[in-house]
Amino acid sequence: MKPLTTVDGLVLPLDRSNVDTDAIIPKQYLKSVKRTGFGPNLFDDWRYLEPGEPGMDHSARKPNPDFVLNAPRYQGAEILLARKNFGCGSSREHAVWALTDYGIRVVIAPSFADIFFGNSFKNGLLPIVLDEAVVDRLFQEVEATEGYRLKVDLAEQTVTTPSGEAFPFEVGEFHKYCLLNGLDDIGLTLQHADEIRAYEQRRRAEAPWLFR
C-alpha cells in the first residue's frame, strides 16, 4: 500500500448527501477482488448516459456532461469533497477500491458510514471529518475557483486552504501509523515475519507430527 503523508491536490466537489456504495461502484462490477481496474466505473450510473457492464470498452461510452466527474476542470483530482453520510449502504470494499483506482487519496465530508470509514484506512484512503459549516465553505470556494487545491498533512492532521487557513482533523493513532507507513493488514502481519518463522520452527521441533 502506498504511504500517505501529505496530499496537495485538486478538489472534486460531489454535492450530494447519503452517497451509498452502490452509487460509488454498482453491483455488477463486484466480481473481481484485484483492487484495481475499478476507476473507470467510479460513480458509473451518474457518470455515463447508458448502463454499463463488466468487459465493456468504457472509453467508448457516452459520458454524462452534467456530472461533476466529467468536468474538465476537475480532471486529475486527488481530494473528493462530499456531503454527510458518505459511503452508506452495503459494506462492499470495492467502493474504496474504485475511489483509489481513480486517483482519489482523501475524502472530506461532515460524516461517513462506519463500515466505509474503516475500509478506507485499510486501503490507503484517508477519510476526514470536518464540521458541516466548514464543508459548506469549502464547497463555495471550490465551485467559485477553478483549479482549487487543498493541502492535507496527515502528520500534522490539518487541511489547509489556498489562503493559508488550516482546519484540524482527528484520526486514530493506529490508522495514522498505518497510512503514514503504507501498511495494510498484510503489511502489518509481515512486520512480524521473523517472529512468525521462529514460532513455526519451534513448533516443528516441539510437535513434528503436526507437520507430516
Curated annotation (Swiss-Prot):
EC number: 4.2.1.33
CDD domains: IPMI_Swivel
Record's signal peptide: none
GO CC annotations, alphabetized: 3-isopropylmalate dehydratase complex
Gene Ontology terms, MF aspect: 3-isopropylmalate dehydratase activity
Record's keyword annotation contains Amino-acid biosynthesis: yes
GO biological process, one term: L-leucine biosynthetic process
Catalysed reaction, written as an equation: (2R,3S)-3-isopropylmalate = (2S)-2-isopropylmalate
Regions annotated as coiled coil: none
One Pfam short name: Aconitase_C
UniProt entry keywords in alphabetical sequence: Amino-acid biosynthesis, Branched-chain amino acid biosynthesis, Leucine biosynthesis, Lyase
Record pathway: Amino-acid biosynthesis; L-leucine biosynthesis; L-leucine from 3-methyl-2-oxobutanoate: step 2/4
Assembly, per entry: Heterodimer of LeuC and LeuD.
Function: Catalyzes the isomerization between 2-isopropylmalate and 3-isopropylmalate, via the formation of 2-isopropylmaleate.
Family: Belongs to the LeuD family. LeuD type 1 subfamily.
Name by which UniProt lists this protein: 3-isopropylmalate dehydratase small subunit
Organism of origin: Thioalkalivibrio sulfidiphilus (strain HL-EbGR7)
